[in-house]
A protein has these predicted regions:
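Glycine-rich beta->alpha junctions and the first turn(s) of the following alpha-helix
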Residues: 107-208
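Glycine-rich phosphate/cofactor-binding loops in nucleotide/flavin-utilizing enzymes
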Residues: 5, 150-151, 155, 229-241
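Short Gly/Pro-enriched turn/cap motifs at secondary-structure boundaries
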Residues: 26, 41-44, 68-71, 88-89, ...
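Internal helix-loop-helix
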Residues: 1-20, 24-30, 70-77, 220-224
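A structural signal for short hydrophobic beta-strand segments in well-ordered beta-sheet cores
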Residues: 51-54
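A short core secondary-structure module
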Residues: 63-109
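A short, Trp-centered hydrophobic/proline-enriched beta-strand micro-motif
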Residues: 29-37
């Protein structure tokens, strides 16, 4: 997740100074990254976020909370979405992204959240109380954060859909083995017509989703904007849930 979803923000929009400082450590695994979008009571409604960053000379002062943040406990570098312009119309034009290092005064972690799956990454709450970060930690341009997110969320959603499809394919293989080995009324349940219908439907849905995701991946890698189609791949992701 850190290298395939979050680091591309730095590679695409970071300054040369930021890249030289952080990219080698990201590549070596010395630090992992996390991105903070979701907030308590707001969810992923970016325009409604309440975490603010107020300019104070050569620094921004961050106040607010984030929740459901993947890698929140173990990350060493955080890409935090903040409101730098509270009067912007529409509201999403006031969003920026700031780089916050672990250990910055005023930054702390809340609970490590319990979850059903994806235990290879932790999920946590983040708290910002008068956290001062230098202006040089601004990713890209002020007020452009929403556009950066919309660009990179395409890749994030495709990656998640690919992972879900891998899970779905393994589920199909496991189920196929089970119905061949499980016997009822003196014969394997794979010989029952209803079982065959269910297995055929599962295989068909996975094949359709695979074709759809492969097409999105190809178009995205060739620079095409597939944001609308990527929103549709929730269907593909549901196969792996």
């Amino acid at each position: 997740m850190s290298s395939s979803i979050i680091v591309p923000y730095l590679e695409r929009y970071g300054t040369e100074e930021q890249k030289k400082k952080y990219l080698p450590k990201c590549v070596s695994g010395e630090i992992t990254t996390a991105i903070g979008m979701t907030e308590p009571g707001i969810g992923s409604d970016l325009a409604g976020m309440r975490t603010t960053a107020v300019r104070d000379g050569d620094h921004y002062i961050i106040n607010g909370q984030k929740t459901f943040i993947s890698n929140g406990i173990n990350a060493g570098l955080f890409f935090i979405c903040v409101k730098t312009d509270l009067t912007a119309t529409p509201a999403h034009k006031g969003i920026s992204i700031l780089l916050v290092e672990d250990g910055t005064p005023g930054f702390s972690r809340g609970r490590k959240l319990k979850k059903l799956g994806q235990h290879s990454t932790d999920t946590a709450e983040l708290i910002f109380e008068d956290v001062r970060v230098p202006v040089s930690n601004l990713l890209g341009e002020e007020g452009k954060g929403f556009y950066y997110l919309m660009d990179k969320l395409q890749q994030e959603r495709i990656m998640i859909a690919i992972g879900a499809l891998v899970v779905a394919e393994e589920m199909l293989k496991t189920t196929m083995t089970f119905v061949k080995e499980r016997h009822a009324f003196g014969k394997p349940i794979s010989s029952f017509q209803n079982t065959q219908f269910e297995m055929a439907e599962m295989a068909t849905e996975i094949s359709m989703a695979q074709t759809f995701v492969d097409d999105l991946t190809y178009r995205h890698m060739n620079g095409e904007n597939v944001s609308t189609q990527v929103s549709m791949d929730i269907i593909a992701k549901n196969l792996g849930m």
